[in-house]
Amino acid sequence: MFHSKLFLSFSLAFLIAGCGGGTGFQPTITGVKPETLQYGKSATIYLGGKDLRSNMVVETNGACVNPSFSSNSTTDILVLNCTVKVVGNFTLTIKTDGGVLVNTTHLTVPNPQVAILTSLGGIVLELEPAAAPITVNNFLSSANSGFYRNTLFHRVISGFMIQGGGYTTGLVKKDGQKDPIVLESNSGLTNLRGTVAMARTNDPNSATSEFFINHVDNGFLNYSATNPGYAVFGKVVQGMEVVDVIASKATAVTNGFSDVPKEDVAITAVLQIK
């Protein structure tokens, strides 16, 4: 009888130890669902499974940096947050803190898109960070900080381009521009109709916030061995008819500036939408 009671007590103790919050079992992930996956922004990725732990190791090979698990994670659902640094495909690998592979998932980050809201309608741009990362990051930083709000398309030339993003009503230069960036004109992207590029001075590395949308193909603005060119970093994917309307507006010389629309073409906001 004594031996039977001892065996029963040992068995119960073993079962209790083995079920302590699931920590004695190998974690499994049965589903991965990204809720938000936007270039340059914080991503939220849900990992569903069993016996999950917040001390698991996340590997993305630099595609989604500073990973952390949200405090509202559970043993059935981990909420992963990280900052997206690439576009295209990347591999999300989850391991135990001991290095045992738990799950590998392939995710895709789309090219970022921004909406330019103007007094004459909306324009949607798709940007190319893989080709022009410095330029795209600079533009998105200005857009997401609200810098472009209430600026103008202040230079408009039909059959050439429309330029904006640096001045407010009365052609007052907007405060808060970032430092000039390095020219990325030798990227393979060219100044075709509907592409967007950075405006600059005669100094190739002088672009800050001003950009222009090509109204026609402008091959003479492209990079060559003898011409530094202008850095294209995206294209219009919606609203080219709005570009055409803006380009058609009557212009005049105002405060020493040429080709200024007689009626303000206001940029009310530039927003990252993808």
Identify the residue ranges that each predicted region occupies:
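Sec-dependent bacterial lipoprotein signal peptides
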Residues: 1-18
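Cyclophilin-like peptidyl-prolyl cis-trans isomerases
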Residues: 19-274
